């Protein structure tokens, strides 16, 4: 990070404030001029108004939430929250790794990881398959991932999002995965176990996709 000229931060993520609060820190304070703007009726060139150094004009005062959080939660509080989120992500990744019904796609560096439901027979088929056959299997898995994610959301017990990412071991093929960010301090190990159990049950409810996968 010390090699960067600037660092941008989305405070609504691990600083636990509402969306809309972002900030940028410059190594060289003079670089703030690169985002300076002026208007004839306000923020005239040469004025000392800090509002000229922003990508926005009128603002809602979200900076106050960042300021307040830095003082109320403080450094020890953020350290506790972030360490807990990292621990939970590692725990969840280990749960996935040790369950032969799932494939851990990206291991967490901090608190974000991706995975998907892949029955053990399908995992073995993917290992043996040539690229063209892998593509066929992955497209069916994409359908199954979408089915599970939508049904889980509709059930209302738990929720994970989904996204597409390139996976190196599948020759850069883009596959649909579950995307999890473990930032909620109220999330427990039991909740994480329940999420996987529910996803396994939902997969069995697929009357067309799962049978096709298991037949390959």
Regions found by a protein language model. Name each.
Residues 18-20, 35-37, 77-79, 124-127, ...:
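Short conserved micro-motifs at the rims of enzyme active sites and ligand-binding pockets
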Residues 98, 150-159, 204-210:
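Structural alpha-beta junctions
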